[in-house]
Amino acid sequence: IPLFLHLLLMSRKLLMKRRTKVVRRMNLMLLLTLLLSPLSLRQGKLHWRLKSDRVRSKRFLEIQKLRELKKEYDLKTAISLVKETAKTKFVETVEAHFRLNIDPKYNDQQLRATVSLPKGTGKPIKVAVLTQGERFDEAKNAGADLVGGEDLIEQIKGGFMEFDKLIASPDMMPKVASLGKILGPRGLMPNPKAGTVTANIPQAIAEF
């Protein structure tokens, strides 16, 4: 705000001396800055708009009455409260944020894991498996949608991506490494920490 007032006073002084195109442009820029910045006018003074200034919906205010401010709820109570306040006609999305007090910049503090949901995501997942030898039949019998070796690797290089999860046996990883640039950006690259590089392929398929 001090910078804004300084520019405004400077433009007024210039305007009094000489009304030029430069001054008009400066005034226009100041006006746009004022309109686009999160400022509000209260009793003739400029104030930054805060989140509390926003008009809250009636539903939001009713939900706020059901919880105590600054109170920490245990997980079970918090989930019950979320379900109790879900009044819309569609299935609402619930986000959970965890503060782990770790710094992912350090290798020993990086976190990557897979959690198996008790009832899944509600959407069918197409699982592909890269393996060879005896594990080939194991993967098929375990219910994998696609099973292949070098042939499937070549298909993926050609643009084939008709799967949601890709599992690979450890002996295939030297060949799978060539798919890093294709699978990596899509989050499909097999990884031991994610449970998608394993010798126990039937178990991995069952988890997905």
UniProtKB/Swiss-Prot annotation:
- Give the species: Pisum sativum
Name where it's found: Plastid, Chloroplast
Q: What is its main location?
A: plastid
**Transit peptide listed as a keyword:** yes
Q: Report which superkingdom the organism of origin falls in.
A: Eukaryota
Quaternary structure and interacting proteins, as annotated: Part of the 50S ribosomal subunit.
The UniProt entry, under Gene3D superfamilies, shows: 3.30.190.20, 3.40.50.790
Q: Read off the lineage from the record.
A: Eukaryota, Viridiplantae, Streptophyta, Embryophyta, Tracheophyta
Which molecular function GO terms apply here?
Answer: rRNA binding; structural constituent of ribosome
Stated family? Belongs to the universal ribosomal protein uL1 family.
Question: Is rRNA-binding set as a keyword in this record?
Answer: yes
NCBIfam families, per the entry: rplA_bact
Name of this chain's protein = Large ribosomal subunit protein uL1c
Q: Its function?
A: This protein binds directly to 23S ribosomal RNA.
Any one GO CC term of the record:
large ribosomal subunit
Keyword entries, A-Z: Chloroplast, Plastid, Ribonucleoprotein, Ribosomal protein, RNA-binding, rRNA-binding, Transit peptide
GO biological processes? translation
